[in-house]
Amino acid sequence: MTFTIDLKDQCIIVTGGNRGIGLAMSQACADAGAAVGIIYNSAKDAEDRASEISKKYGVKCKAYQCDVGQQHKVKEVFKKINEELGPVTGLIANAGVSVVKEALQYNKDDFNKIFDVNVFGVFNCAQAMAQIWTDTGFQRGSVVIISSMSSQICNRPLTQCFYNSSKAAVSNLGKCLAAEWAEKSIRVNMLSPGYVKTDQTSHMDQKLRDFQADGVPLKRFAEPEEMAGQAILLLSPKASYMTGGEYFVDGGNLVW
């Protein structure tokens, strides 16, 4: 028996899909045969990344500007993607931000900035997608929420209690949505990366990166591409009985 994951004739929306983990997932979806709608907020290179993906993999791929924290805007853009590239069959809710400060320095603006994207933004995207599927009667929708191993741990010596808390919140949000939307045949799962070579980890000096990598059983940070396989599986029919789960792709960090 041959086991392959094929997303041909599918369409996937990837928020934050023009860089880091999101870009790797956009590329992986396209490589598996899916059309891809990349959501970006302010990056100038998003349209270039979409064009490159389209040419390399021979699929439709377009970039759409959208602040995921604006509920009405998300609904408008998702409807547009569904009309232009769709029907959309899956969502990777990847967009996220972090502010690294000591707890005594945080303020409400920091909280709002992080939770508006990492929690409310994820909800907006999942809600908009689920509404489209409900309205059109589509019953095989899959949502993959990119959380973090920080949903479970504090990641010392980094001081990012708001980020960690937002990931704990979004992981539980995903479980709640999975339970509520199961009757609609909409699956919701969380993929929680460990340390990955992205812009978010590039601020660390080499000494800190070495310290963090030494705490991982596999003794290294992951490449963004190493996150994509699990996401593709969760989007595919091969995972048709998987919902409400949180899957850690962390090099064994949580068992160390």
Swiss-Prot record:
Catalytic site positions: 148, 163, 167
Annotated residues for binding of NADP(+): 21, 49, 67, 94, 163, 167, 196, 198, 200
Pfam families: adh_short_C2
Coiled-coil parts of chain: none
Annotated catalysed reactions: D-mannitol + NADP(+) = D-fructose + NADPH + H(+)
Entries under SUPFAM superfamilies matching the protein: NAD(P)-binding Rossmann-fold domains
Sorted UniProt keywords: NADP, Oxidoreductase
GO MF terms, alphabetically ordered: mannitol 2-dehydrogenase (NADP+) activity; NADP binding; oxidoreductase activity, acting on NAD(P)H, oxygen as acceptor
Keyword Oxidoreductase in record: yes
EC number(s) given by UniProt: 1.1.1.138
Function recorded in the entry: May be involved in hexitol or pentitol metabolism.
UniProt family annotation: Belongs to the short-chain dehydrogenases/reductases (SDR) family.
Protein name listed in UniProt: Probable NADP-dependent mannitol dehydrogenase
